[in-house]
């Protein structure tokens, strides 16, 4: 248990710290692709996927990590990811975004997090299990994309590296706007940890490294997998309700670490403060959290479990879920932000 606590908690703490300090929000990034025609954060996300993919595929090849591929429902990945994409716009953050913003003191994120956790728990082990199984048993295929295509996985990795490099290099060649900033208040390590603003591409690199480290770190406890948020969140609420210590796996300490890491980063940068949402935000956060929990359960993952971890191993589920999640974000963004301005 000590290995589980330290391994999961430390990876989560570092992850949460990075997310808070770099303001790495996939909900905002996917929304900006549509509304602002700004793909910067999406390209940073591709960097994270690519970095993780290079490392984890070699770990699998060396036998350090076991076979991560499982069967999944294509219907669940499509319907669930679309619903999840809508939910994260309503909630104001994806799974990790909700966890790290809760650590900053946003009470709206606490509301979204509660309903996300409880609805996911209900889908996985509660009264909504029949609803979960309703879709999970349809259109089931294996997760191994390279195997389905009949090609070595290294071909897919080379393609990913080329595509990511192309977009990143093209973006870096564009003239950068000079943004006015205040003179630094701190010096040394404190400045770099709690004050300096980092480019989103650097954030993507760091997140990719953390995602890579998560694989062998969780393997130490017998768990085959990388970063994942939904199932651990469901297990945490189940433990709180039932007291069943079997629910306390590596992932539970990962998500708790994300919360603590974000809190420490927010306190150190003086960005932590309790913020009370209005009734409209509470309503959206509630509905968004429910959509997130149900959607991620159907899809078998969230923007991290599917969008980052599964895509890195060239999981069919991951590469179906990611674009469908983005489509869900765009749909909700149109309804909530674009359409009212047209009227």
What feature does the model see in each segment?
Residues 1-343:
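Membrane-interfacial helix-loop segments of redox and metal-homeostasis proteins
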């Amino acid at each position: 248990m000590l290995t589980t606590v330290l391994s999961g908690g430390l990876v989560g703490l570092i992850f949460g710290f990075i997310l808070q300090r770099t303001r790495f929000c996939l909900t905002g990034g996917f929304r900006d692709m549509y509304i602002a025609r700004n793909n910067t954060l999406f390209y940073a996300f591709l960097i994270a996927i690519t970095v993780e993919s290079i490392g984890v595929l070699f770990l699998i090849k060396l036998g350090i990590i076991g076979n991560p591929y499982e069967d999944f429902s294509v219907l669940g990945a499509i319907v669930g990811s679309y619903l999840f994409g809508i939910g994260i716009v309503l909630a104001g953050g994806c799974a990790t975004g909700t966890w790290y913003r809760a650590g900053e003191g946003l009470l709206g994120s606490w509301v979204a997090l509660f309903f996300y956790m409880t609805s996911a728990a209900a889908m996985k082990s509660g009264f909504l299990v029949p609803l979960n199984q309703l879709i999970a048993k349809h259109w089931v295929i294996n997760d191994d994309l390279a195997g389905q295509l009949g090609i070595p996985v290294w071909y897919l990795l080379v393609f990913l590296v080329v595509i990511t490099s192309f977009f990143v290099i093209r973006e870096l060649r564009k003239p950068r706007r000079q943004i006015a900033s205040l003179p630094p208040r701190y010096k040394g390590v404190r400045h770099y940890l709690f004050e300096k603003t980092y480019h989103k591409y650097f954030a993507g690199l760091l997140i990719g490294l953390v995602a890579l480290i998560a694989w062998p770190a969780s393997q130490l406890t017998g768990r085959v997998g990388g970063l994942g948020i939904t199932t651990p969140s469901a297990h945490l609420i189940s433990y709180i309700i039932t007291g069943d210590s079997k629910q306390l796996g590596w992932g539970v300490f990962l998500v708790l670490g994300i919360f603590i890491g974000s809190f420490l980063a927010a306190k150190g940068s003086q960005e932590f403060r309790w913020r009370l949402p209005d009734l409209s935000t509470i309503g959206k956060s509630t509905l968004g959290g429910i959509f997130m929990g149900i959607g991620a359960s159907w899809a078998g993952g969230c923007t991290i479990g599917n969008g980052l971890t599964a895509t890195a191993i060239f999981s069919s589920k991951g590469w179906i879920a990611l674009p469908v999640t983005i489509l869900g974000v765009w749909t909700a963004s149109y309804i909530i932000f674009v359409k009212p301005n047209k009227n």
